[in-house]
């Protein structure tokens, strides 16, 4: 029985039964695939370690298919009181999904482009609804799929090495994994700025932005993890108390934030427009070095992706997470059929010439009809939870 067949069974069973089916299937192949993710039961909790350090712990479909059923099992286990997720290697929590594999699979007419997004979004929703305290240690690079594994959880711990970004508009995609839900809910217009520019937040700014709930010095993560796992039948309040104590004692990266101290007024003003064209005009009229730099960055992005992203966030601001994930699944499938994603992957990841030829090449040529096609229902193929 291959994995695609196993997953097709899942639409007809409950979430608990879904977990059981996957676990049974994985036992037949775990010896060849388990190295990508480590699943350990320690002390009072379960620990998930993303274990592809050479690839900055990039998220694969195989990893999703191991994490999801174990998460559901631990959630329903009366002896498991919390879940910790972290990345191996010290450089990254998770730098995103395997984008190159997606492009190659689509060209080969394989089902990966449906399976990965569908199963990843189901996992994102499971993290958001998890009934046990979920602690993501977002130490190092955290982008794309790594954001989906962390930001929807109850607790997110940043360090001085954290680097957060949603750079998808630069490869012909959009900030998915629930970006349409959490980005417009950040302070002011910060989420719109991050989504359209791919701007990188670092260190304490990841906490200041609200992406992380706590900040802890990276050298303290190991003892923090051990202290959490040594708790006796902890509640969410107990977990929060430990995290707060480490947060209060953190000393690293205490310099004032340039982005929050100096530029938030500009971000709120320039990114409050309802069209990408007006946002660019606002930046031009502002004329400050910061505004001009952001205008230049936006002008390099896929025009189609920019318009998709702005609409995604505007619509997502009033939707539930599940509604957003359904919307985003529709957009991903349209992007896989389009030009810009494959061109972005070519320019950034394959040929690495960094000069993608977007089609259309200008914002004015992305019509409302074009844009609407990315948001239309997929009927029976829509994402289901």
UniProtKB/Swiss-Prot annotation:
One cellular-component annotation, GO: mitochondrion
EC identifiers of the protein: 3.1.2.4
N6-acetyllysine sites (modified residues): 54, 91, 100, 220, 296, 352, 359, 364
Pfam families: ECH_2 (PF16113)
Family matches, as InterPro entries: ClpP/crotonase-like_dom_sf (IPR029045), ECH_dom (IPR045004), HIBYL-CoA-H (IPR032259)
Keywords: Acetylation, Branched-chain amino acid catabolism, Hydrolase, Mitochondrion, Phosphoprotein, Transit peptide
Transit peptide: 1-32
GO molecular-function terms, A-Z: 3-hydroxyisobutyryl-CoA hydrolase activity
Residues bearing the modification Phosphoserine: 233
UniProt keyword annotation of Transit peptide present: yes
Subcellular location: Mitochondrion
Pathway(s) served: Amino-acid degradation; L-valine degradation
Keyword Transferase recorded: no
Broad EC category: hydrolase
SUPFAM superfamilies in alphabetical order: ClpP/crotonase (SSF52096)
Sequence positions that bind substrate: 120, 145, 168, 176
GO biological process: valine catabolic process
Taxonomic superkingdom: Eukaryota
Modified residues (N6-succinyllysine): 54, 91, 100, 220, 249, 256, 296, 300, 352, 376
Catalytic activity: 3-hydroxy-2-methylpropanoyl-CoA + H2O = 3-hydroxy-2-methylpropanoate + CoA + H(+)
Family to which this protein belongs: Belongs to the enoyl-CoA hydratase/isomerase family.
PANTHER family, A to Z: 3-HYDROXYISOBUTYRYL-COA HYDROLASE, MITOCHONDRIAL, 3-HYDROXYISOBUTYRYL-COA HYDROLASE-RELATED
Task of the protein: Hydrolyzes 3-hydroxyisobutyryl-CoA (HIBYL-CoA), a saline catabolite. Has high activity toward isobutyryl-CoA. Could be an isobutyryl-CoA dehydrogenase that functions in valine catabolism. Also hydrolyzes 3-hydroxypropanoyl-CoA.
Official protein name in the record: 3-hydroxyisobutyryl-CoA hydrolase, mitochondrial
Taxon lineage: Eukaryota, Metazoa, Chordata, Craniata, Vertebrata
Protein encoded by which gene: Hibch
């Amino acid at each position: 029985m291959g994995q695609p067949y196993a997953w097709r069974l899942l639409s007809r069973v409950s979430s608990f039964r879904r977990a059981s089916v996957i676990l049974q299937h994985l036992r037949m192949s775990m010896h060849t695939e388990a190295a990508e993710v480590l699943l350990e039961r320690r002390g009072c909790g379960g620990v998930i370690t993303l274990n592809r350090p050479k690839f900055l712990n990039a998220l694969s479909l195989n990893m999703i298919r191991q994490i999801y059923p174990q998460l559901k099992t631990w959630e329903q286990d009366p002896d498991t009181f919390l879940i910790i997720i972290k990345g191996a290697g010290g450089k990254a929590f998770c730098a995103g999904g395997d984008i190159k594999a997606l492009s190659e699979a689509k060209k080969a007419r394989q089902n990966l482009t449906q399976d990965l997004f569908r199963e990843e979004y189901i996992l994102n929703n499971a993290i958001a609804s998890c009934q046990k305290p979920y602690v993501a240690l977002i130490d190092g690079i955290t982008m794309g799929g790594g954001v989906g594994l962390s930001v929807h959880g109850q607790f997110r711990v940043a360090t001085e090495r954290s680097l957060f970004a949603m750079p998808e508009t630069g490869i012909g995609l959009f900030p998915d994994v629930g970006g349409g839900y959490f980005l417009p809910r950040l302070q002011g217009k910060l989420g719109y700025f991050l989504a359209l520019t791919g701007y990188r937040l670092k260190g304490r700014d990841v906490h200041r932005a609200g992406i992380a709930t706590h900040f802890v010095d990276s050298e303290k993560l190991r003892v923090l993890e051990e202290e959490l796992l040594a708790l006796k039948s902890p509640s969410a309040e107990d977990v929060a108390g430990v995290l707060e104590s480490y947060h209060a004692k953190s000393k690293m990266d205490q310099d004032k934030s340039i982005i929050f101290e100096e530029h938030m007024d500009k971000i709120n003003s320039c990114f409050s427009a309802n069209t990408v064209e007006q946002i660019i005009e606002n930046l031009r009229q502002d004329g400050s070095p910061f505004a001009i730099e952001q205008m230049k960055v936006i002008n390099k992005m896929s025009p189609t992706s920019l318009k998709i992203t702005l609409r995604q966030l505007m619509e997502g601001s009033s939707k539930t997470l599940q509604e957003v994930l359904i919307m985003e699944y529709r957009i991903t499938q349209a992007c896989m059929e389009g030009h810009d994603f494959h061109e972005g992957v070519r320019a950034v990841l394959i040929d690495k010439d960094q000069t993608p030829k977007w089609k259309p090449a200008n914002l004015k040529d992305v019509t409302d009809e074009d844009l609407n096609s990315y948001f239309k229902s997929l009927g029976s193929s829509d994402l289901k939870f």
